[in-house]
Amino acid sequence: MNREVFIEQLDTTESTVDMKWIFDVLKKSVESNFYDGNPRGHRNLIIVMEELAELSKEISKELRGKGDNINILEELADVQLGIYYVQEICGITNEELNKAMNIKMNRLEDVLKANGKYQ
């Protein structure tokens, strides 16, 4: 996306999102690529991988002192939408994802407690 347009729209766009709308649009996007001879979601998953790589690149720049929060924000938004694509394509519900995140966070909390870094 054009950087100037992205920055301009940041000032005028709502900060709340309608998750039903997001999943409806993403589902239509997945279904629109279904008849290209590839498995359902194939093209979308390729794009998700590309977005993950772009975020990785922006994080690398940040670690080298050449970061740009606008670029990071834009790529982070793309990756978050990519996560929703993966959920849609793989049939992973929000409930399942939330449970998995709780398991991971409990593990992290336990490690931090064991190392005296969290009480």
Which ranges hold each PLM region?
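Flexible "arm" and connector segments at domain edges
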Residues: 1-119
